[in-house]
Amino acid sequence: MPPPSDIVKVAIEWPGANAQLLEIDQKRPLASIIKEVCDGWSLPNPEYYTLRYADGPQLYITEQTRSDIKNGTILQLAISPSRAARQLMERTQSSSMETRLDAMKELAKLSADVTFATEFINMDGIVVLTRLVESGTKLLSHYSEMLAFTLTAFLELMDHGIVSWDMVSITFIKQIAGYVSQPMVDVSILQRSLAILESMVLNSQSLYQKIAEEITVGQLISHLQVSNQEIQTYAIALINALFLKAPEDKRQDMANAFAQKHLRSIILNHVIRGNRPIKTEMAHQLYVLQVLTFNLLEERMMTKMDPNDQAQRDIIFELRRIAFDADSDPSNAPGSGTEKRKAMYTKDYKMLGFTNHINPAMDFTQTPPGMLALDNMLYLAKVHQDTYIRIVLENSSREDKHECPFGRSAIELTKMLCEILQVGELPNEGRNDYHPMFFTHDRAFEELFGICIQLLNKTWKEMRATAEDFNKVMQVVREQITRALPSKPNSLDQFKSKLRSLSYSEILRLRQSERMSQDDFQSPPIVELREKIQPEILELIKQQRLNRLCEGSSFRKIGNRRRQERFWYCRLALNHKVLHYGDLDDNPQGEVTFESLQEKIPVADIKAIVTGKDCPHMKEKSALKQNKEVLELAFSILYDPDETLNFIAPNKYEYCIWIDGLSALLGKDMSSELTKSDRDTLLSMEMKLRLLDLENIQIPEAPPPVPKEPSSYDFVYHYG
């Protein structure tokens, strides 16, 4: 008799018949099991049938996937994938429109299954679908529902990666692009057309060229002015794909075209400031657009200044002229010789705060920030001239060594902003932290620089800094900026107000508050008390982590970014013995019941938890593997027999919660950054509560000394 681990108990359904309760021996061939089921209902030709799941996406069961069947699973006896594909192929070409519509509905559903998709594609199903679309002008006006299902099936089939996107014809591309450009088209058709075009652009460089010729900026921007956020999301996703795949020499042209069509202001008014909350996928696409826009600065950021280029040197002359000679040209002054002018220029460049007073062009030879720093300085000097002149003259007139060097500050600040905003980095698959204020101005980076250079000047004065304190000031300014950004101000003015509240004295107060637990609680008695309390705190954190796992979390399925989001959910049983998980149709807003999660893993079967590049799905997905931030959110459960459950957490917080909780289940230490932070916070609070009675009492560093022995013990009385 086979061991219990090879036996799974399932229920198998068939329309119009009572369900069969069956014990499946996983060592038996699947064909033998199907024959037994067919015999139970007296069905001939068992080779025409197969098993599939009754719930969820109703995936077919194959020899490769049968190990996923768990005890208590409900299965269906169904027509085999090859037979179903053949029948649907015939029905999709039926003369009856009702038959074709029903066939397309079923095809759109079954195409998500890779087993069925392989069979259908092997019958040239993709070619049949593309021909239906290519000849579909009449179809669009009368049978838009059928066209929507056709496009859905096509996208599902192509998404499996079985065939290359390069097989798509130019006629098909023109037809899909036509649906996007038509003013009145069914929402479902438009949504799928945008998704198909995005997939083409992302998966084929040759198709990018063709689509870029067919789709205009104006056509895509018009879809951002609708009230349907899903259409807006797909439109921005296609814009991002075109932006991402465009050759470097054409990206700036695309950005200019977007500016001419007022893309930024349309997104601001119709998406960000719309009356609907921003969904996760929209937030991600806005984040991607923000990153790609800032990445346009990378070329200037990595370009060194050529000291021999007169045009570039003229920019530095212009900075000097605006600051000191706005109304006059010293070269025309009577008796002004070359040597005298050079001496005056050197003095002026020193007052401007350049490190190299004789040849300030040398200050811009370091990359980053390269020429981008000079661009920022010129923008400030021309667009915010009063601010520029005030900053320069205010510091150049000081005689007490407390002047803030504008040139050096501007260069270092530009470099800092590039680091904070990760200019030049590719978008992260798992992030959605866009900043609304960057969509409020066409020159957002330059405006941000203008705000921050004023902040730097203000902080310099508050610190009464000298040249030796330059790096300290830059550290404080970085802290001010990074503390202000997470609040996501809606405008640059709000950001400026937030920075104003984060003065140097406030930063000191925050630092002192954050260091209090480290600075104030280092005496031996306090350390001993901390060590006594710490196990209680860690147990409290452990219970919180396990409770969060019992509540569960939703995770996005890998590889579905360019289509409608798909989610799966995982939660721990209340007795902490089983992990339940399963697919979802939508991202849940509340708790998902155990009954709706079809799969489960006994905690006792879990062998290990692996993270990052050790995860199987990170080794398989080369594109994901290259993304450092996705790697930092990836983890996998390894369980018997040689199976894995792969996760990509939505954010760092959820990642830490799950890593801690799973580690606690396995009896291992919780070592995440979140645990350390929670432990320190809770320890600090508990210590303060326990030490309230000792307020204003100095706790000695050492125990009190033992007194000397008395000269005699005559005071001791012995009872007889």
UniProtKB/Swiss-Prot annotation:
List of residues that carry Phosphotyrosine: 48, 717
The answer to whether the entry has keyword Cytoplasm is yes
* Keywords tagged on the record: Apoptosis, Cytoplasm, Membrane, Phagocytosis, Phosphoprotein, SH3-binding
Pfam families associated with the record: ELMO_ARM, ELMO_CED12, PH_12
- Which terms in the GO cellular component ontology are assigned? cytosol; membrane
Q: What is the recorded function of this protein according to its Swiss-Prot or TrEMBL entry?
A: Involved in cytoskeletal rearrangements required for phagocytosis of apoptotic cells and cell motility. Acts in association with DOCK1 and CRK. Was initially proposed to be required in complex with DOCK1 to activate Rac Rho small GTPases. May enhance the guanine nucleotide exchange factor (GEF) activity of DOCK1.
Q: Which PANTHER family match?
A: ENGULFMENT AND CELL MOTILITY, ENGULFMENT AND CELL MOTILITY PROTEIN 2
What quaternary arrangement does the UniProt entry report?
Interacts directly with the SH3-domain of DOCK1 via its SH3-binding site. Probably forms a heterotrimeric complex with DOCK1 and RAC1. Interacts with ARHGEF16, DOCK4 and EPHA2; mediates activation of RAC1 by EPHA2. Interacts with ADGRB3. Interacts with AUTS2; the interaction is direct.
Protein name in the entry: Engulfment and cell motility protein 2
